[in-house]
């Protein structure tokens, strides 16, 4: 039986982008798409952990699903930077997406008294997963910037701002999840 997943076309170290062009798997575009996929998977894991720990409706669960859908908008923007395949594009990150992300972070942060020092460790698995997701968001941001710098005429300031806010959101979400159980993250001790 022939696999529907394995094609063997990437065995030489190249892969095709959405726009049809072939790139090395270490090209800035592929690095950006790959780290975005990692962010998507970590966001999904966090969402599933929240569903398991908080049966019923928790607004954060729905918001994480919303973010996951937006990751696909970002991915198609990166994979087709010159819009050669508009039929595959479902839109792009707009100001209203950025505002919704900022509003959600502000909602969570308004209920917190954040520590004045660096966080050494989360206090439970779900908050730790939020921290891992924040790290993935920062990694993706670096790859997105590298791709932007390597791609002439690719300038997406709203998308870049959105990507920049993601790690802040996940950090605040982690602290919010700890606060909701009366726990606080382990802050760095003074030297």
Model-flagged regions — what are they?
Residues 1-191:
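Phosphate/pyrophosphate-binding loop motifs in nucleotide- or prenyl diphosphate-using proteins
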